[in-house]
Amino acid sequence: MRLKLLWVGKTQESWVRTGIEEYAGRIRRYLPLEILEAREEKGAQAAAMRERECERLAKLIPKGGRLVLLDERGEAMTSPELASFLSKNRDQGTQDLVFAIGGAYGFTDQFRSQAFKSISLSRMTLTHQMVRVFLLEQIYRGFTIINCEPYHHE
């Protein structure tokens, strides 16, 4: 299985980039990981921005990729539940598991309809920059759970 992370806009803060690099490196010990950025839309109405950003994200999804949205409306999961989700996808032969983080105005309904699953990291509002690090850390944590490594504590 290959993992792809898609998000809108460049990572602005150096400390966020450092966190991304740290956890991306750890994840790559378990499987291939690719991070792709879709250009952020500026200067338009919210609906138009959302539409254009989702079009750009859609172009980055490989054919047959299983799309998972990070969305405030998504299903809340525990870390062990995410680990189970990752493990099942790997064991069932998913070639590309694609996690997408939307822009400031989220996803269009059409883009949401393409998703295999939608998950939420928190009921609180998180910045789109910080979600990148949180998602990577949770994916890494998931693989340590799968491999019975001493990182996650219950």
UniProtKB/Swiss-Prot annotation:
Top-rank lineage group of the source organism: Bacteria
SUPFAM superfamilies referenced in this protein's UniProt entry, alphabetically: alpha/beta knot (SSF75217)
Keyword check for Translocase: no
Alphabetized PANTHER family for the sequence: METHYLTRANSFERASE (PTHR33603), RIBOSOMAL RNA LARGE SUBUNIT METHYLTRANSFERASE H (PTHR33603:SF1)
Gene designation: rlmH
Positions that bind S-adenosyl-L-methionine: L70, G102, L121, S122, R123, M124, T125, L126
Native organism taxonomy: Bacteria, Pseudomonadati, Thermodesulfobacteriota, Desulfuromonadia, Geobacterales
Catalytic activity of the protein: pseudouridine(1915) in 23S rRNA + S-adenosyl-L-methionine = N(3)-methylpseudouridine(1915) in 23S rRNA + S-adenosyl-L-homocysteine + H(+)
EC number(s) per entry: 2.1.1.177
Top EC class, one word: transferase
Cellular component per GO, a single term: cytoplasm
Free-text function comment from the UniProt entry: Specifically methylates the pseudouridine at position 1915 (m3Psi1915) in 23S rRNA.
Identification of the protein by name: Ribosomal RNA large subunit methyltransferase H
Cross-referenced Pfam families: SPOUT_MTase
InterPro entries: Alpha/beta_knot_MTases, RlmH-like, tRNA_m1G_MTases_N
Principal cellular location given in the protein's record: cytoplasm
Keywords: Cytoplasm, Methyltransferase, rRNA processing, S-adenosyl-L-methionine, Transferase
GO molecular function: rRNA (pseudouridine-N3-)-methyltransferase activity
Family: Belongs to the RNA methyltransferase RlmH family.
Assembly behavior: Homodimer.
